[in-house]
Amino acid sequence: MLATVLTDKRPIIKVSINGHETAALVDTGASLSIVSESDMSKLKFKRGSKLAGTVIGLDGSEQSMYHTDKDFDFKVEGLPAYQFVIGNIDAIKSSIKKETGIEISAIIGYPTIKQLELIINPSTNEISIGYKD
């Protein structure tokens, strides 16, 4: 199965968060999968408990992250994806929108890439999904 890739400039795919269609960056270098804290009300999700410790962002700043609540629902081509945390990704969102015109709501990091068995083929601009529910 193929994910719907939205641009040839970055590996950005169509996803569903709590039934709302949006976009996510597939980032093989990200150790966490993060959903945008600033999109909580738009996508109708709440944050759960705070993660222990802090995470260092791309700019070197420390930030707190939160678990998603029990009702959080993230899907790629109808398949459920897990292991997301909530964090501030506004700087990344802004950079990507400036470059591609697409506003992302999440970053799919390595744990979720493994779970969905995503394979990125930059030659064909395709992202295949090996996981079957």
Predicted feature descriptions by range:
Residues 1-133:
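Pepsin/retropepsin-fold aspartyl endopeptidases
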